[in-house]
Amino acid sequence: MTIAKGGKNVYGAAVGILMLESRFPRIPGDVGNATTWPFPVMFKVVPSASPERVVLQGPDGLQSAFIEAAQELVRTGVDGITTNCGFLALFQDDLASACGVPVASSSLMQVPWVQAILAPGKRVGVLTVSAATLTPAHLTA
C-alpha cells in the first residue's frame, strides 16, 4: 500500500527551469523546449531578465527576481532547479541558499571538474554567446 503525502500544489514536475525573457525559437533539444526532457518540467520566466541584460550588461539588480522566481517554483512543487543561461553561474550560491532544493544554475559549474579529469596540458573548451563578458568569476562560481 502506498501512502500519498500532501504539501505541494503540483506533482510530477520535479525539475524547475528559470528562463530568461526571450522570443527566439526553442527547438527540441533546447532547455526551453518542454519536449527536450524525457520527464515533465516546470518553467518560470524571470521578468526583466533578457539575454541582453544578463549576458551583455551583467545580472546586477536581478538577483532578487531570480530568487523569488526560484522560490515560487519550489512552493509550486519542484524538487530541483536549473536555468537556461550559463551566465547565471554568478547566482549559484544565492539561489542554492534561498531555495532549500538542489540548484544547478549553469553548465559552467562543470568546467573545474572536467579540467581536473583532463590530461595535463589539455584545456576545457567553452562555447559562449559572449566571450567578451564571460569572466573567470563565471567559471569559479
Each model region followed by its residue ranges:
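N-terminal active-site wall of soluble small-molecule enzyme domains
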Residues: S64, E68-A69, F87-D94, A98
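Gly/Ser/Thr-rich loops at beta-strand to alpha-helix junctions
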Residues: G80-F91, A104-Q110, V129-T133
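Short, well-structured alpha-helical segments in soluble
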Residues: G61-G77
